[in-house]
Amino acid sequence: DYRLCDPQTIAGTIVDLEKRGIGDIEFVDNVFNSPYDHAIALCDTIAKVRTNTRLQTVELNPLFVDDNLIGVMEQAGFVGIGITVESAADAVLERLKKGFTGKHVYKASEVIKRHKIPCLWIFMFGGPGETEETVQETLRFAERYISQRDVALFMIGIRIYPGTELDKIARAEGILTLSPLEMLEPVFYLSPSVKLEWLLNKVHNSIADHMNFMNPHAIGLPFLPAINLLGYWLGIKPPLWKHTRTLRRGLRWLGKDL
């Protein structure tokens, strides 16, 4: 079931926030573009109020990504979007019960290429059904189908929450024996069919060869807040991740990297 907010109310809130000096707003809806019709109506309504606020969301489902949606998001003022696909391999997507297939992932990539909004692609390696072959299939997708203008974020392992489908899978496979109370500290699932060292090496090599790829460790690097502040004073607009390629090149010149 969905709890939907009225598009007019949301648009009015954006206008009010803009009057208070807020120039950047991010939608943290779990799946922004589902229901699809509601997302279209929302973007159409925001576009009509002609706000100058920069909008973002990194919660798009590839199943509902098409030219119509991305077009109205551009008109509404979105300057950054993200698609959480987790994998491009059908074997993994089916085990995760994502509700979409690799075909939808590839189709979404073609749509994104036809538009100007920069896109952050989010992958999680090591889920149920993951093998060396599925890892390489997902990396091939990222390397061949994600534009250099866009960014890929690679994460390894999927956090297990008590009572979820992943929790049941991990216990059935003998990977997880902790009680729910013992899982307050994060516990992660990694497919027994993939060796961690091999996976880390494959992902590391792909990131090293592609300046628009990164891992979550980059987000916590101590010098990033200073770079963010410098970008603000230089007038560089969010989202900062869209500058990953340029930033990594500069850091490599200084002998560092993300």
Give, region by region, the residue ranges found by the protein language model:
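Radical SAM [4Fe-4S] cluster-binding motif and immediate context
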Residues: 1-120, 125-127, 140
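Structural recognition of alpha->loop->beta junctions
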Residues: 70-81, 137-155, 181-182
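Flexible glycine/acidic-rich beta-alpha junction loops that bind and position SAM and/or redox cofactors
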Residues: 37, 91, 95-96, 125-133, ...
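Bilobed periplasmic-binding protein-like "clamshell/Venus-flytrap" ligand-binding domains
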Residues: 119, 152-153, 216
